[in-house]
């Protein structure tokens, strides 16, 4: 299979997001040792190659998935590959369940997360406080925290059509988070959350002053490079973990909170988390409840 054929498949798959296309390209490159022959090779050979070169079950699934999609596009058989995909998916789920069991005893409580958050405020670690506070109260992903801090002036908060930025808007008595760029945006659209927290407002003002910047005049990013520029996703994830309790990931934070609320059987709170995060209640419980 040529790169040109793969490009043909991508062009025909207009529903794919930029992120997904990038991931597909990365998986396709892994078939280089077999000349990327996803169309001409037999299913058995492709399965064998993936099993021997894929590494983790999750990576094998990703490789097999792109191979299946490409072969379907060119009307080639995929029955054996689909069977292998089901087997790998089952193995991967068992691995995830085992990890959940380990995390049940290792992860801290929500009270500990809040105590850490409060300590950041006391110690005037404004950037850290804002990050962990937003992540906890709104169940945010890393990407959601890639945002600009702006004032509540109409001209700045209106935004342009197709705006792909996230904003933390500082208002007189509260603040508002506006998300135009997050994982499930195409499904749930723009999200707006008002945050009634005087501590958060103070932390935002102090962070701006600490950086010697002017709100509304300078570009102010919550997470940025030393020079104040936009960070890539990997750097954002590392930066966030430098602020969190015990270096936990945003996924760990969500697992702690979801699991505790699920144990209390508080459906309304779970629905709020589901809405804030931009995911279904079913996925929320399956992926983040440690007892499921």
Q: Could you tell me what each predicted segment is?
A:
Residues 146-155, 260-261, 276-278:
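Amphipathic alpha-helical scaffolding segments
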